[in-house]
């Protein structure tokens, strides 16, 4: 004699189906089914999706699409960590929980797979029969980047040949975990011309794949964030060039000469007719010395504001000051010339007894009087 389980209304039946995957693409999830004592009301509770080690096709295509949209924002001037954080955020908005490092690792593996597929295609007799997934998407990114920098002279009317695409990429024998790996275009002389990513972020994470851009003549060109901006699309600049900004004005300055020549070039570019000291500060607020080996990038021109003081003048017959003069000293030579033209040997702070023999002892905003 068999007794049905349905005859026991007080018994709860719980069924759990968990961690179901198909071909490694589906996201693992949990479904918990609960049955009440009456056997009529069912409740389905979905637990949060866990991040799978493998990427689904939708995830990968979304990552490639987002990376392609932001390709213009990747540059060689600073870290790209914030860009990968934006990509990770957009991935979450589309329902894919992927951290910035996971997105970067996946992108790096896609590039590695593309390189292998391209090598295999070159060995094939006609066109290559085995191609990676998303091959065309990655090739389109290279094609768009190549058009922007215009390093290849031939018109891009057809799909790039195997040799051209292969020359567009340069991989070392090192693994992708090596931070010094390059993924760049290579000219006939073997020098890379195009960088796909930038240097490591400040946390040391292997977010980008970096290489210095080099033109055909072996000299790195300046690469602005969006377009060259020189009136000729994709026309590279010869020599080492930095971008210097002062107020509302921006100039491109060559640094192939000596330190003194670079200073004179900056003075001429911004019409600095005084002998005021100046220096260059990069985007990380680091002051750089002026020489041909300084890093290429964007700089802000800082000019010495000098020391502004007030000097009171007396009449020979009247001990009271006649008037005050505001004076700004920029160099020790300016200070000495000011004293000599008035027949003074030094300055003394008003209502004080210490003589000021050199400019460094002056304090901005103070009132001084001349001493003979």
UniProtKB/Swiss-Prot annotation:
Query: Does Cell membrane appear among the keywords?
Result: no
Gene3D superfamilies, alphabetized:
Homeodomain-like
Which GO molecular function terms does the record list? DNA binding; DNA-binding transcription factor activity
Q: Which one Pfam family would you cite for this protein?
A: Myb_DNA-bind_4
One BP term from GO: regulation of DNA-templated transcription
All copies of the Myb-like domain together span 47-111
Location within or outside the cell: Nucleus
Outline what the protein does.
Probable transcription factor that binds specific DNA sequence.
| Residues where Phosphoserine is found | 167
Q: Which InterPro entries match?
A: Myb_DNA-bind_4, SANT/Myb
Naming one, the record's GO cellular component terms include: nucleus
Q: Where are the transmembrane segments?
A: none
From the UniProt record, report the name of the gene that encodes this protein. Answer: GT-4
Listed as disulfide-bonded, the cysteine pairs are none
Name of the protein:
Trihelix transcription factor GT-4
């Amino acid at each position: 004699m068999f007794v049905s389980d349905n005859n026991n209304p007080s018994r709860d039946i719980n069924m759990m189906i968990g961690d179901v995957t198909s071909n490694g693409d589906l996201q693992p999830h949990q479904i918990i089914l609960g049955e009440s004592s009456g056997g009529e009301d069912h409740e389905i509770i979905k637990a949060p999706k866990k991040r799978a080690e493998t990427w689904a096709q939708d995830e990968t295509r979304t990552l490639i699409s987002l990376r392609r949209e932001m390709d213009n924002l990747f540059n060689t001037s600073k870290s790209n960590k914030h860009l990968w954080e934006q990509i990770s955020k957009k991935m979450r908005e589309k329902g894919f929980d992927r951290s910035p490092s996971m997105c970067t690792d996946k992108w790096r593996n896609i590039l590695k797979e593309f390189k292998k597929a391209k090598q295999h295609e070159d060995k094939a007799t006609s066109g290559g029969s085995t191609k990676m997934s998303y091959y065309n998407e990655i090739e389109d990114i290279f094609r768009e980047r190549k058009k922007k920098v215009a390093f290849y002279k031939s018109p891009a009317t057809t799909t790039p040949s195997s040799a051209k695409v292969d020359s567009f990429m340069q991989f070392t024998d090192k693994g992708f975990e090596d931070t010094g790996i390059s993924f760049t275009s290579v000219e006939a002389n073997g020098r890379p011309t195009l960088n796909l990513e930038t240097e490591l972020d400040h946390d040391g994470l292997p977010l980008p794949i970096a290489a210095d851009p080099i033109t055909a003549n072996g000299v790195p060109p300046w690469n602005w964030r969006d377009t060259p901006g020189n009136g000729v699309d994709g026309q590279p600049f010869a020599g080492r060039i930095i971008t210097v900004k002062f107020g509302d004005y921006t100039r491109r300055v060559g640094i192939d000469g000596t330190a003194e020549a670079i200073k004179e070039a900056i003075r001429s570019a911004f019409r600095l007719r005084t002998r005021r000291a100046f220096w260059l500060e990069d985007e990380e607020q680091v002051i750089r010395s002026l020489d041909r080996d300084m890093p290429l990038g964007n700089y802000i021109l800082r000019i010495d504001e000098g020391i502004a003081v007030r000097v009171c003048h007396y009449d020979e017959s009247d001990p009271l000051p006649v008037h005050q003069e505001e004076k700004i000293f920029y160099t020790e030579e300016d200070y000495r010339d000011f004293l000599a033209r008035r027949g003074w040997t030094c300055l003394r702070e008003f209502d004080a007894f210490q003589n000021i023999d050199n400019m460094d002892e002056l304090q901005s905003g103070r009132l001084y009087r001349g001493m003979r």
